[in-house]
Amino acid sequence: MTTITFRSQGSRITGFDVQGHSGYAEAGADIVCAAITSAVRLVETTVNDVLGLAASVKVRESDASISLRLPGSLGQTAESTCQALLTGMMIYFAQLHDEYPEHIEVLEDE
């Protein structure tokens, strides 16, 4: 199972942790894993490459995990954009959980 934990401070989503394999299918044929990976890469690329922010990203292949943390202080436009991206990602993963409850878990942690 893949566990996705969204981190927040108050109402601000500060980042997320994704860990584990979904186990839906074998590597290369796992549509749940592909959906998760695609969303994570889209958000990370948008935050760091398009918006030019310096979000901290850590990848550990040993336990199939990736984490992203937003910088502490962002301008109003960047903050609003990042919150919209992360909220959309949270909703998307909740919908995936509804479709594949045995393969993805979504948590929120303050």
Protein language model regions, located:
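Short, conserved glycine- and acidic-residue-centered signature motifs
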Residues: 32, 36
